[in-house]
């Protein structure tokens, strides 16, 4: 396949298993900045001054790819859910948050940064599956902090086959993709500040028997997105085989879909019991070994599909499972260095790794409550259901920022 001429496309594209931006190879180090649209708003939670500072810091570091939640869904006052919400009820939108998303994309465009925007969430922290099921008449979604994750996961396993829930989501997709930015006058479908539409954050079937319906839903969703926007890339947002009930064939099939342009994987050693909270340093070698095995298997799939791979989430707690600013990050730094080395080594050899987004950006946040986010607190890289500081990289985390800068330099040499 011939490469486009310089400047032929203003959008990030894929050619022969690799990303192109402005006609050149595009390799990157990015981050997860889920709260960007809220920060860009002028209502509750909004802080445009902080947003500009965060974007400027990231830009100075060479971080130019941000993975962002379009918006949260549902009622407010749920302690484990992000607020303010964007979609209050199906088809009822909070214009303040929409303005925040517009502002964010405008500011990113000024800095030649690009966004990966995810539209749904299998987890409770932004509504997602549970929100759509409730409004499809499936009953009240359990709250994991009160009812436990098994009850929640059993409930949302219905989503894969609930056509009414899908239709409500598709209405939302059409609304968002049909939007025009109020500040720039540019339609979202024409905005080069958007790299990719992502179906969801870690979409899962939540049950092996739900996998066929899950695959069909992803195919429908990607086809809808493609029909609405022929300019931007589309991705699933998957964790990898972990998000497919450890069915590797399922992962390969969802990535093979003609409307899916590239593959995603996530890595969470602590969440996946590869590392224990009281042995984070001691368990790092095992976490690294499992990480390499997981990555290698997914790279093999990407080679068969000839599609790029992005390590779109990865994180590691602070030493001794601390959360406060200034606490040690030796284990995290070691894990980041290892993941970065695997990504860069493969990319330098012409492999399918194209980039990575660490989780997540805490930046200039000053958390007030470690154990739980409360309304009025600064947003961090940790959503409302998690301890504030658990996986966040703050502006004061000098050793971690040094590791990130080193990777940025390495990846930019490939451009």
Show which residues each predicted segment covers.
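Active-site mouth of glycoside hydrolases
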Residues: 9-309, 314-414
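Bacterial Sec-dependent N-terminal signal peptides
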Residues: 1-8
């Amino acid at each position: 396949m011939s490469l486009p001429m310089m400047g032929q496309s203003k959008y990030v594209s894929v050619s022969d298993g690799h990303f192109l931006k402005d006609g050149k190879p595009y390799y990157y180090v990015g981050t997860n900045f889920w709260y960007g649209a809220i920060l860009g708003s002028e209502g509750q939670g909004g802080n445009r001054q902080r947003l500009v500072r965060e974007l400027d810091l990231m830009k100075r570091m060479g971080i130019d790819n941000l993975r962002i939640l379009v918006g949260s869904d549902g009622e407010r006052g749920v302690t484990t859910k992000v607020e303010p919400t964007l979609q209050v009820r199906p088809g009822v939108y909070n214009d303040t948050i929409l303005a925040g998303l517009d502002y964010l994309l405008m500011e990113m465009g000024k800095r030649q940064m690009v966004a990966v925007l995810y539209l749904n969430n299998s987890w409770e922290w932004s509504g997602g599956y549970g929100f759509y099921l409730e409004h499809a008449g499936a009953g009240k979604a359990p709250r994991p902090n009160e009812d436990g994750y098994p009850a929640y996961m059993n409930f949302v396993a219905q989503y894969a086959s609930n056509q009414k829930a899908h239709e409500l989501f598709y209405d939302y997709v059409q609304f968002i993709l049909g939007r025009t930015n109020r500040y720039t006058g540019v339609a979202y479908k024409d905005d080069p500040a958007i790299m990719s539409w992502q179906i969801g954050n870690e979409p899962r079937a939540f049950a092996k028997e739900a996998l066929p319906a899950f695959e069909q839903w992803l195919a429908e969703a990607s086809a809808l997105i493609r029909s609405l926007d022929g300019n931007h890339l589309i991705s699933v947002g998957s964790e990898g085989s972990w998000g497919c009930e450890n069915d590797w064939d399922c992962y390969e099939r969802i990535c093979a879909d003609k409307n899916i342009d590239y593959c995603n994987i996530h890595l969470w050693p602590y969440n996946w019991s590869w590392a224990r909270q009281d042995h984070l340093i001691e368990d790092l070698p095992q976490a690294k070994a499992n990480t390499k095995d997981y990555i290698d298997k997914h790279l093999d799939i990407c080679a068969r599909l000839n599609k790029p791979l992005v390590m779109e989430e990865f994180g590691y707690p602070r030493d001794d499972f601390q959360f406060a600013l200034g606490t040690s990050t030796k284990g995290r730094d070691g894990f980041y260095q290892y993941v970065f080395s695997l990504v860069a080594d493969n990319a330098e050899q012409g492999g399918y790794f194209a980039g990575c987004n660490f989780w997540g950006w805490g930046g200039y946040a000053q958390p007030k409550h470690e154990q739980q986010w409360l309304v009025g607190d600064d947003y961090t890289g940790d959503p409302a259901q998690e301890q504030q500081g658990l996986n966040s990289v703050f502006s004061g985390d000098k050793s971690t920022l040094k590791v990130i800068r080193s990777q940025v330099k390495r990846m930019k040499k490939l451009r």
